[in-house]
């Protein structure tokens, strides 16, 4: 499960690293405690190049009658993308995206201690995601996404039984549909990221309050183990 994220603070770095052609972020601002139903930066691709845009966290299928379904669709299990009704349509349509974050938070089940998780070099993470577009009866349009999860690596296993799929740069083009890839090749990407390239540390339990949002949340909590 991945239910909290720290949003990128350096958008210019993202644009350069991911070779963004179109910036549709609007009035973007970094956040240190983004929760499901928040808006996060997402990368999609079309013939005109890669687009960096804002989407709502929690996928609303195009057929949904109520957008509240997004409260339970912020994560998508890699093993069931083509069989889970909420995600099956986006998967079959090739509506894949990259969700960009500086890191995420996870809670250790034994004592509910939260941990921050990041790449060892502190580069932005690129989560594998699916997206969809929903039209309300009144005509409003919502673009939304889910973060795909997989089994944990050795770093995450002591605190949780799932982790987000983090894609390395050599997977981006295929995942975004810029180059042809068979379904089995795409599914092979949905694996745990190497533990030796990641790091984690305990943080303040205030991160459990989605209304609290400050840079101190990502700082190590020295007295915790």
Predicted features along the sequence, with ranges:
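Short linear sequence motif anchored by a di-proline
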Residues: 1-225
